[in-house]
Regions:
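Sec-dependent bacterial lipoprotein signal peptides
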Residues: 1-23
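Mature, structured domains of secreted/extracytosolic soluble proteins
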Residues: 23-334
Length: 334
């Protein structure tokens, strides 16, 4: 009897590896990614099936975005091909993207990497409240929620307050304008004439879709397993705040000096909780202008959840040149 029991145990032990191997093969087969599932965004761009993107891919790697495209994030990619990127590099005087300062590469490439996953339809008429709206509701302000959050931002800067204190100002990520035909339909204005007035070196090609800032779309909605890719005909240059644009032009210095007389550094609790420790400070600040539009802030609100404001609100400033101010002050006070 003892011998029979021992023999059974030996048989079980001999069969166990076969059973485990069979189970492992079955599990591997069960969890294997089906052939019909799309590749990740990095693989799609690397495949050559939709064009050559070697310079853009090199930039993504330099800027530290490769893992995101490989599946670490859900995103939308605005992808300039090699011809578009070489044109941009030539214009900037660079032989290769590796010749650019890393912070510039990060700022530029990050402007082509959007948070969240948007196909063509969602970018034509983005709805900040989600996709549960009725058809009638979707026609309300159609196309006017046109700005989308990117990974492009400037590093925090240390500024001096009027009292002489040093504060760290945090710069939020840039938003990218995407102009769809619905945007112009809702406003009741001609798309081509108005778009090309603001982008005189670009061509409106969005009659059935959209233009991405200064770029035309060559191919919409290339599918990846972690988002969508929209191929464009040129590199999209990061837009600056109105404040930065004015600051970089001497002829608006008087206007900016007057505007800055209302300037105040405001502590931001939410930003401080999220990011202050990473920069070795207790508090992060935003530079605002009292009751005037906060043209130095990248966002109209620091809450990333306020999609309605973030995707729609923008400012227009009528800024007289310094010579006009001099003439005004001369007439007014002499």
């Amino acid at each position: 009897m003892k011998n029979k029991v021992s023999l059974r145990r030996m048989l079980w032990l001999l069969c166990l590896p076969l059973l485990l191997t069979a189970c492992k093969d079955s599990m591997d087969e069960h969890y294997e990614v089906p052939d019909w599932v799309a590749d990740n965004a990095w693989e799609v761009l690397s495949s050559g099936e939709h064009g050559n993107y070697s310079i853009f891919l090199q930039g993504l790697e330099i800027a530290g975005y490769k893992q995101m495209l490989e599946g670490k994030a859900i995103l939308t990619i605005i992808a300039p091909d090699d011809d578009a990127f070489q044109t941009y590099l030539n214009k900037r005087g660079f032989t290769s993207i590796s010749d650019m300062p890393v912070n510039e590469v990060s700022k530029l490439i990050g402007y082509h990497v959007l948070y969240y996953s948007y196909n063509k339809e969602k970018l034509v008429n983005f709805r900040p409240t989600g996709s549960t709206e009725t058809e009638e509701e979707q026609n309300i302000k159609a196309g006017l929620y046109y700005k989308h959050r990117t990974r492009s931002s400037d590093a925090p800067t240390v500024e001096t307050t009027p009292t002489g204190a040093s504060v760290m100002v945090y710069h939020l990520e840039r938003y990218l304008p995407i102009f769809s035909y619905r945007y112009f339909q809702t406003k009741g204005i001609d798309a081509k004439n108005n778009y090309e007035a603001f982008y005189p070196n670009s061509t409106w090609t969005g009659d059935d879709g959209f233009n991405v800032s200064n770029a035309s779309v060559k191919e919409y909605g290339i599918i990846a397993n972690n988002g969508y890719i929209h191929a464009v005909d040129r590199v999209v240059e990061p837009l600056e705040t109105i404040y930065t644009e004015l600051k970089n032009k001497e002829k608006y210095s008087t206007f900016l000096d007057l505007y800055d007389s209302f300037g105040v550094y405001v502590a931001d609790d939410e930003l401080s909780k999220s990011y202050a420790k990473a920069y070795g400070v207790d508090t992060l600040y935003q530079y605002q202008h009292g009751g005037l539009p906060n043209i130095a802030c990248e966002w109209p609100t620091s809450s990333y959840l306020n999609f309605t404001a973030l995707t729609a609100l923008s400012y227009s400033i009528f800024a007289p040149e310094a010579a006009l101010f001099r003439g005004f002050f001369s007439r007014r006070f002499h």
